[in-house]
Each structure stands twice: as structure tokens, then as C-alpha cells.
């Protein structure tokens, strides 16, 4: 089903194969991670509450603390963990690593790698930092003005307005 349903906090895809998480985290006012877990469990039939609780502990996040008191990086971590635990095939991410310290960036990258190895999972990551994603992505494309500009290897050294000319004997 390609029809989208919109609620106040997330776009929900009825086919349950995709989970979006935007650049800015969207949580209920005064929500805790536990409350968001319970909400996601209702929306996503395959949501793994036990795994979410384990990951919260692994990432050192207090499940009963109000998310609004978290730092930007901690909010991003909760968003990633919620997305992972939906067990959807695709996780649509916007600026996934923005706000994360280097240790947490590596932890999230490792979590993505583990998910990719253990189940059918594809994170689709939008980022302004190629360096941040080049070590974990199989394919990278550059978007510009609503279209695909190309892949980084083909665009290196190319300036806007320049042409590639091939001449031969």
C-alpha cells in the first residue's frame, strides 16, 4: 500500500516495511522512552520491546527519564533505537549522526551493521557529511534540486557548469 497516513509525530507506512525518522526527533510532550516504546508497539506489529529495553541499557539511556531533558545526541539515539526495533525492512534516516559524539556514532554504525548482517534491513541515510557515511554505505548518490546529481566518484573535480569532453585520434 503506498498511501501514507500522517499523525502528529510520524508518518506511518501501512505496509510496515519502512520506518522514517527525521532530522528533528518527534516525541510526545513529557514522554519517556518507555512511553514511546509502548506507542511504537501499537503502531508497528513487529516492534521488539525486549530488544528496545536491552538497547536502551546498552546505550546508557534511562527509560523513565523524560526525553525532553535529553541532549540532542541522546534524543537521536532514542530515535535510532525505536526505528531499529520496529523490525521494518527499511529505515529512512535524516542526518543520523548529527549530534552524536564519536563513540555514539561508532555505536550506531555498529548497530546498523549488525542489523544488516542479521536480517533483511536497509537504512537509507540522508546526510550532508559524506565522510560520515562513506565507510558504512554500499551506494552513495548526491541529490541536488530534487534529482540525483550523480555518485561522488564521478563528480570529484567537476565544477558546476563544466563539461566532460572526450577526444580521440
Predicted regions and their residues:
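Catalytic Walker B motif of ABC-type/P-loop ATPase nucleotide-binding domains
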Residues: 91-95
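Conserved H-loop
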Residues: 120-128
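Helix N-cap at the start of a conserved alpha-helix in ABC-type nucleotide-binding domains
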Residues: 102-104
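Hydrophobic anchor residue at the start of the ABC signature
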Residues: 80
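ABC-family P-loop ATPase nucleotide-binding domains
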Residues: 22-75
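A short, surface-exposed alpha-helical micro-motif characterized by mixed small hydrophobic
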Residues: 133-135
